[in-house]
């Protein structure tokens, strides 16, 4: 009769503790927003580039699609590390409104009023 095997538990994910200034954290949040805008731009450029037969059409689409998952993960990290910060429209924290309203199902749509 076989003895039941004990399943190995997965290793806990490594964590890191870092110290960031407020400006550093704002820079990370703005980088996420810039990434989102650029990703959306690439997506929006595909059809017009394809319509004129540009060799860049496929590259624009591939980049928009390929980096969408990275953008989603980046946005989730920024949301998590800024969860306790108020989105203040009078400061650089105004970007948090955009980070927190990210909806990947609305592809190519981004609020551009800062």
List each model region and its residues.
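Positively charged, phosphate-engaging catalytic surfaces used for nucleic-acid and nucleotide handling
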Residues: 1-114
């Amino acid at each position: 009769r076989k003895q039941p095997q004990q399943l190995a538990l997965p290793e806990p994910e490594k964590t890191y503790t870092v110290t960031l200034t407020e400006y550093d954290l704002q820079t990370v949040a703005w980088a996420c927003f810039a990434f989102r805008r650029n990703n959306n731009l690439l997506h929006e450029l595909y059809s017009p580039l394809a319509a004129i037969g540009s060799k860049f059409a496929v590259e624009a689409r591939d980049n928009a699609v390929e980096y969408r998952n990275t953008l989603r993960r980046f946005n989730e990290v920024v949301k998590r590390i800024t969860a306790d910060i108020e989105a203040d429209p009078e400061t650089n924290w105004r970007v948090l409104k955009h980070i927190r309203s990210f909806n990947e199902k609305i592809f190519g749509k981004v609020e551009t009023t800062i």
